[in-house]
């Protein structure tokens, strides 16, 4: 049977599990979009290709399924770059069909020509051009296999003349991939058991590589009487119903997670590529298990490293572990976690404050959201409030830009997740700067009938950048934002829109917003002076904040300094 190359690519992708393709149409993409129209795959028409990259990556990451996006030649496919960088760093298998000019006109001086192979080489696991029609099946199969096996973005560059060329095609081709079992040698597992059995104050630090090892992890913690801290990417899998949980560490962590890691004498790292060595203990014995060999000892020296799947390794390890009886370190760590959560809670006092604190907003969302809701958050302060205050329960999921650290990811990711999970509540915690960057794709919500809920943390500034400037002792420069009334703007676009400025009105507004049957925007005016306090405040940060306060007064900006002190420390 003969089919054109575009139809062959679409057929292979569909047979390999792709349900949705995000993008904007263009002339070099016409045969691809025609093939999608004739298939069971759905086309999601975004207003900016970057949004398509974010959306496809979010769908893939949370669903575990291969997803696609497609763009026209030149600027069209180039616009995907930041969204796909995020997806690639997050380990989301996504296929990009980057359509290209006719093979006879691909030189660097020709209008709209872009060398996609050079552009996408750093943010993909596979990037190849189909140089002749007979290579279409091979390239497409290799792209799918690479995306699934290596967990990343695969790029198929498709010249327009090749897309419409016909080739012989069998009835059905699909690529199926199964993850192999990787288990360390028995001698290495025995050595790991010896280290853990000798430890007195053992701590476990679990990353996203532990997501399938929850049962074995809790059994190990019980035997070792070991508290468990977790990375932000492991929150969904480790945090809930966990009597050993002490929370996160790092810049966006909390006191109990930070303290446990600093005070343990033996630290077991499980499936984590945590990047900040200053949060590791200074004198502890550190052992590590990771399925990726390159991660072992990458961020901090370790005494013993095992290359293997975390769950498979723990199942082999458990019979070799002694049942410890001294639970003093565990008990103190868990007690501190409970006190830390009580200390940072705003549920009781938030409505009585003189401004809306974003922590209170986050806790109200946590209180009233569905038990299986999916949350996204923009990189920056919105990310901190989501990770600290949204509680997981084994059903909820959270997603933000942790490895790439981009702005403007939350709303696009929410669109992709609502498309993938139409019956689940999807809530985006967007910064005002992040949302404004890709504001046009609110129209995608109405056009595609995607009933996502967009909360805007409107502090009228690039808040996280402003905080970084203040910690350095600098005046906050060029971070102010002149925002429209996002509530009225949403209403003008045909969706629910409401703005809230008073703390006492916030809870009712959150309930109305979440219960609305359709796309909705809640514009919440939060304190512009809120500090994202790390779990451990260093002296240089205190000095820097003091310098900022002094400079603000000297430059006639004393009102800013006073507001910062009142909002964060006096909290009237």
Regions inferred by a protein language model and the residue ranges of each:
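Aromatic-enriched
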Residues: 160-187, 345
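Active-site diphosphate/adenylate-binding microenvironment
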Residues: 6-9, 17-19, 24-27, 32-33, ...
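N-terminal cofactor/phosphate-binding cores enriched in small/glycine residues
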Residues: 2-85, 89-90
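Thiamine diphosphate
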Residues: 97, 105-112, 297-299, 305-307, ...
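Glycine-rich, anion-gripping cofactor-binding loops and their flanking helix/strand elements
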Residues: 61, 208-289, 393-424, 436-440, ...
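Phosphate/pyrophosphate-binding active-site segments
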Residues: 4, 134, 158, 169-171, ...
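Glycine-rich, acidic loop regions that bind phosphate or pyrophosphate groups
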Residues: 98-138, 234-333, 510, 514
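Structural signature of the thiamine diphosphate
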Residues: 2, 19-20, 61-71, 75-98, ...
């Amino acid at each position: 049977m003969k089919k054109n190359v575009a139809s062959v690519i679409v057929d292979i992708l569909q047979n390999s599990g792709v349900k949705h393709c995000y993008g904007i149409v263009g002339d070099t993409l016409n045969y691809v979009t025609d093939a999608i129209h004739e298939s069971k795959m759905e086309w999601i028409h975004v207003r900016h290709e970057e949004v398509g990259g974010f959306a496809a990556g979010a769908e893939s990451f949370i669903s575990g399924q291969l997803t696609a996006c497609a763009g026209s030649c030149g600027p069209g496919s180039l616009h995907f770059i930041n969204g796909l960088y995020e997806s690639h760093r997050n380990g989301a298998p996504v296929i990009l069909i980057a359509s290209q000019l006719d093979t006879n006109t691909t030189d660097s001086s020709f209008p709209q020509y872009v060398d996609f192979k050079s552009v996408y080489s750093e943010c993909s696991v596979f990037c190849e051009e189909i140089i002749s029609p007979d290579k279409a099946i091979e390239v497409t199969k290799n792209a799918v296999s690479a995306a699934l096996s290596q967990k990343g973005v695969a790029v198929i560059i498709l010249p327009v003349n090749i897309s419409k060329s016909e080739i012989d095609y069998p009835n059905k081709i699909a690529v199926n991939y199964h993850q192999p079992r990787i288990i360390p040698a028995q001698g290495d597992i025995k050595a790991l058991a010896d280290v853990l059995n000798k430890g007195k104050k053992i701590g476990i630090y679990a990353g996203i590589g532990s997501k399938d090892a929850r049962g074995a992890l809790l059994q190990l913690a019980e035997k070792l009487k070991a508290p468990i801290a977790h990375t932000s990417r492991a929150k969904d899998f480790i945090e809930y119903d966990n009597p050993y949980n002490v929370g996160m560490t790092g810049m966006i962590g909390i006191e109990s997670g930070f303290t446990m890691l600093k005070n343990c004498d033996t630290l077991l790292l499980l499936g984590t590529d945590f990047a900040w060595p200053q949060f590791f203990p200074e004198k502890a014995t550190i052992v590590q298990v990771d399925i990726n060999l390159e991660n072992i000892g990458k961020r901090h020296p370790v005494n013993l490293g095992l290359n293997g799947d975390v769950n498979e390794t723990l199942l082999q390890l458990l019979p070799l572990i002694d049942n410890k009886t001294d639970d003093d370190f565990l008990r103190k760590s868990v007690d501190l976690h409970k006190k830390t959560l009580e200390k940072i809670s705003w549920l009781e006092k938030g409505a009585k404050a003189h401004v809306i604190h974003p922590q209170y907003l986050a806790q109200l969302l946590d209180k009233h959201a569905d038990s299986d809701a999916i949350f996204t958050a923009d990189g920056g302060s919105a990310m901190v409030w989501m990770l600290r205050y949204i509680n997981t329960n084994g059903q909820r999921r959270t997603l933000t830009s942790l490895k790439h650290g981009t702005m403007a990811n939350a709303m696009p990711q929410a669109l992709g997740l609502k498309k993938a999970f139409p019956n689940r509540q999807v809530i985006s915690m967007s910064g005002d700067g992040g949302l404004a960057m890709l504001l046009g794709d609110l129209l995608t919500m109405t056009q595609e009938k995607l009933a996502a809920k967009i909360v805007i943390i409107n502090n009228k500034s690039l808040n996280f950048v402003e905080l970084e400037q203040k910690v350095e002792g600098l005046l906050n420069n060029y971070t102010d934002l002149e925002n429209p009334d996002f509530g009225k703007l949403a209403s003008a676009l045909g969706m629910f829109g409401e703005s809230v400025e008073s703390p006492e009105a916030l809870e009712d507004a959150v309930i109305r917003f979440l219960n609305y049957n359709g796309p909705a925007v809640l514009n919440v005016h939060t304190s512009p002076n809120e500090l994202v306090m790390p779990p451990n405040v260093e002296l240089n940060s205190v000095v820097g904040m003091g310098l900022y306060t002094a400079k603000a007064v000297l430059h006639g900006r004393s009102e800013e300094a006073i507001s910062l002190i009142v909002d964060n420390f006096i909290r009237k």
